[in-house]
Design a protein with these regions (language model features):
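A diffuse structural propensity rather than consistent per-protein peaks
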Residues: 33, 156, 189-190, 286-294
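Exposed alpha-helical structural elements
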Residues: 16, 35, 70-73, 92, ...
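Short secondary-structure junctions and interdomain/linker hinges
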Residues: 23, 27, 78, 104-108, ...
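Conserved active-site-adjacent core of cysteine acyl-enzyme catalytic domains
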Residues: 1-34, 38-186
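Alpha-helix capping and helix-coil boundary motifs
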Residues: 85-93, 185-193, 232, 289-292
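Charged, long alpha-helical assembly modules
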Residues: 243-319
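Amphipathic, soluble alpha/beta structural segments
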Residues: 111-116, 120, 162, 183-187, ...
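Noncatalytic regulatory segments and standalone regulatory/sensor domains
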Residues: 139-246, 255-258
Length: 319
């Protein structure tokens, strides 16, 4: 039985986008749920394994995009535009943030979670990216809705600026990125949104940067399995169990629903099996049963290969 999941997930940018569009006048009956928005970013489609010396980091997400780019991709598919601003001095950034928040919702990010002092474990999260909706600048404070479970939270502006600078976020090209002034310019159907996304989804699944420090596709899963069977497993445990595996399970579950709606029943079934494998791996990784965890990564490599084949256009597969 398949029951759609509702609950917590590390969907910082998808949940923030949902809040921003809802408060910008998106009709509630037309605004897709965060899981659908996540798929429009193309992030659930692919794997990105970074192996730099003894430093290992895996993201079960497209190696062709990052969350900042994904937001722009999703907005385009949705038929919405916004004002996008970034860079500048801290003083100028804070001033424009306050002015924009006085007019409507502001989606700010990426932020460095390591500088978000209202998070109990922020000291262990340096370099992890995040997105929030800014409610306003109140003198020396910034107030936000943080979709990780912190509504209406306020923090010193100087600390917010430190997080917003995002110096340790690996993909942040410039500091102080924000989106505001959201407006709808087209009203595409859900079918059109999905069709606009499928090409990038296929490309993300098949993408493999090829090393020597970064890998994707089925090879990324097989390399991860080999590392989990060796001495490197303990370097990955915290990242896997607290973030990467539960997020991958949720993304795969939502991607299954997305592809089912698109009429790709075979691919949807494969993504649902991926979600189950990630969910099983969560238990084994917490228990530090690395052989069992590695076996599931091998199974996921096979599923990824099957997905690439299942989503090939008919002319490419000889159909």
């Amino acid at each position: 039985m398949t029951i759609r999941y509702t609950g917590n997930a590390a969907y910082g940018y998808a949940n923030s986008l949902y809040m921003a569009l809802r408060e910008s006048g998106a009709p509630p009956t037309e605004l897709p749920e965060p899981g659908f928005l996540e798929c429009l970013t193309t992030m659930p489609f692919g794997t990105d394994y970074l192996r730099v010396g003894r430093d290992l980091l895996v993201y079960f997400s497209s190696p062709l995009a990052n969350p900042d780019q994904g937001l722009s991709t999703a907005l385009d598919a949705l038929g919405w535009e916004c004002r996008e601003e970034r860079d500048g001095t801290p003083e100028a950034a804070l001033a424009r943030l306050g002015e924009a928040a006085a007019r409507g919702p502001v989606l700010a990010g990426p932020l460095d979670m390591g500088a978000l002092g209202y998070m109990p474990q922020h000291a262990q999260l340096s370099g992890s990216d995040h997105f929030v909706v800014v409610l306003g600048v109140e003198g020396e404070r910034v107030r936000v809705h943080d979709p990780d479970g912190y509504p209406c939270v306020a923090m010193p502006a100087v600390e917010f600026l430190r997080a917003w600078r995002a110096e340790r976020v690996r993909y942040a090209p410039t500091p102080y990125a924000m989106r505001s002034g959201f407006r709808q310019t087209r009203r595409p159907t859900r079918e059109a949104m999905i069709a606009r996304t499928l090409g990038a989804a296929r490309a993300g699944l098949a993408a493999d940067p090829g090393g020597p420090d970064r890998y994707g596709g089925p090879r990324a899963f097989r390399l991860l399995a080999a590392d989990l069977r060796g001495a490197m497993a303990k370097r990955l445990v915290g990242h896997l169990t607290s973030f990467a595996l539960p997020l991958a399970a949720r993304r795969s579950h939502d991607a299954a629903a997305f592809l089912r709606e698109a009429g790709h029943a075979e691919a949807a079934g494969l993504f649902e099996r991926k979600a189950q494998c990630f969910g099983e791996a969560q238990y084994w990784a917490v228990q530090e049963r690395w052989t069992d965890t590695a076996d599931l990564m091998e199974a996921l490599a096979d599923l990824e290969g099957a997905l690439i084949h299942a989503l090939e256009p008919a002319d490419a597969s000889g159909g």
